[in-house]
């Protein structure tokens, strides 16, 4: 292993198809030769935080290949000597197996993509329906607010009308009380007048009796004088 200021590389000599590990001691931008790529990102250039990263050396690599490690302050270069694959048949079988595995993974991912597309369409439709419902609810809410304001206005008018009616009723009650008092006074006066009328009737009868008695006496006296 070679100790560098920025990174450690697990091997400086490798065969085609091998994987070497790069350990970064600090964040850096790492650029690989085009015949190599990072196992995690499948790219040959990435800005990476400190950590260990696997680098795949493809069969297109041969000879001295370079890895550039760059930070804001410094740049280092690691050279890896890539030798020809000693067992190309095994590598071919491994590559075929890897391709088959990748195809299966692609099919699985395509299935997931198809599922998520359908799920997205369903969720999007639900979202559209919910949006429409929200719009309808917002419209209904605005209408209810307008109706509420109208009812509040009517309630205010009704409250004013009720106050006016209560005032009018109070005046009418006062008038009724005054009329009742007047009626009571009239009833008292009628009672007095009735009593006076009863006394006057009794006196009239008495005077009528006295009148007829006096008249009878005078008539009798007149006949008596005429006989003499």
Curated annotation (Swiss-Prot):
UniProt superkingdom: Archaea
Membrane topology: Single-pass membrane protein
Keywords, in A-Z order: Membrane, Signal, Transmembrane, Transmembrane helix
Subcellular location: Membrane
GO cellular component, one term: membrane
SUPFAM superfamilies linked to this entry: Myosin rod fragments
Chief location of this protein within or outside the cell: membrane
Signal sequence coordinates: 1-16
Transmembrane segments: 206-225
Family: To A.fulgidus AF_1225.
Protein name according to UniProt: Uncharacterized protein AF_0540
Lineage: Archaea, Methanobacteriati, Methanobacteriota, Archaeoglobi, Archaeoglobales
């Amino acid at each position: 292993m070679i100790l560098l200021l920025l990174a450690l590389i697990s091997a400086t000599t490798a065969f085609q198809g091998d994987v070497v590990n790069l350990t970064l001691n600090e964040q850096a931008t790492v650029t690989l030769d085009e015949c190599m790529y990072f196992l995690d990102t499948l790219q040959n250039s990435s800005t990476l935080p400190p950590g260990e990263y696997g680098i795949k050396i493809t069969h297109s690599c041969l000879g001295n290949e370079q890895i550039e490690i760059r930070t804001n302050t410094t740049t280092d270069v690691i050279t890896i000597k890539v030798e020809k694959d000693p067992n190309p048949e095994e590598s071919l079988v491994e590559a075929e197996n890897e391709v088959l595995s990748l195809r299966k993974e692609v099919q699985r991912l395509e299935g997931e993509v198809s599922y998520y597309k359908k799920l997205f369409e369903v969720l999007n439709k639900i979202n559209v329906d919910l949006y429409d419902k929200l719009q309808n609810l917002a419209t209904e809410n605005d209408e209810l607010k307008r109706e509420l304001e109208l009812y509040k206005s009517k309630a205010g008018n009704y409250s004013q009308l009720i106050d006016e009616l209560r005032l009018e009723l109070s005046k009418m009650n006062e008038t009724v009380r005054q009329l009742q008092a007047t009626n009571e006074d009239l009833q008292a006066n009628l009672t007095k007048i009735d009593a006076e009328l009863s006394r006057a009737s009794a006196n009239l009868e008495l005077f009528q009796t006295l009148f007829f008695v006096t008249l009878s006496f005078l008539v009798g006296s007149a006949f008596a004088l005429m006989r003499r």
